[in-house]
Amino acid sequence: MTSRKEQLDAFLSRTLSETIAHIPLEKFAQCFPSMKKGKVIAVIHQQLIEFFEKSCKQEYANLIKERDLNKKLDMLDECIHDAEFRKLHGESEVDISNKQPQEILKAHLYSHKRELLDKLNQDLLDIDKENEGLSTQIAAEEKATEDCISRMQSLIQKLEKTVYGMNEKNLAKEAHDTLNDLLPYIQNPSSTWTNALNEQGNIER
């Protein structure tokens, strides 16, 4: 079945052809009696016809776009198809003469609201799925954090036991004294070694 848009396009072409047919070259030449008939008047006539046809088609395209007629024609086709389907399956016809304009408009917009509702439901399902994935990721990160904390606590406990064992054996004090002896060499190695050498020389004398 031909769509409403195709029918409207065909109507435009037919109307343009009929209009142009009423402007033949002979009648056009009569508007310029001072000009001789020939190629010049024929070229002017052809250019005028082409300009007229192009302007009409451009205006038609602008009108279709500004009023969104393609979408509205598709909606009309859909409404007619639904009505024919209901009639074919024995559903009673709706007498719109007894309906208020608000009811007619509501019925007209029902299908579009239904499409919008379906889209919103799909978006909601997508969001739920995304949230589920994020929850799984967060749970995994929490588990990894807990494992890391547990390992750190275990290491701290081992360190505390090691320090406690060193204190019992008096190793901690020895390590502390040794570190204090080495600290000057670490902080200022050049001057420390010089002083040490001078002291050694004095002892030998």
Swiss-Prot record:
Gene Ontology biological process: attachment of mitotic spindle microtubules to kinetochore; cell division; chromosome segregation; spindle attachment to meiosis I kinetochore
Transmembrane segments: none
Domain of life the protein comes from: Eukaryota
Keyword Nucleus appears in the UniProt entry: yes
Keywords from the UniProt entry: Cell cycle, Cell division, Centromere, Chromosome, Kinetochore, Meiosis, Mitosis, Nucleus
Main subcellular location of this protein, as a coarse class: nucleus
Location(s) in or outside the cell: Nucleus; Chromosome, Centromere, Kinetochore
Its biological purpose: Part of the Mis12c/MINDc subcomplex in the outer kinetochore which has a role in kinetochore function during late meiotic prophase and throughout the mitotic cell cycle.
Name of the protein in question: Kinetochore protein nnf1
Organism: Schizosaccharomyces pombe (strain 972 / ATCC 24843)
Organism taxonomic ancestry: Eukaryota, Fungi, Dikarya, Ascomycota, Taphrinomycotina
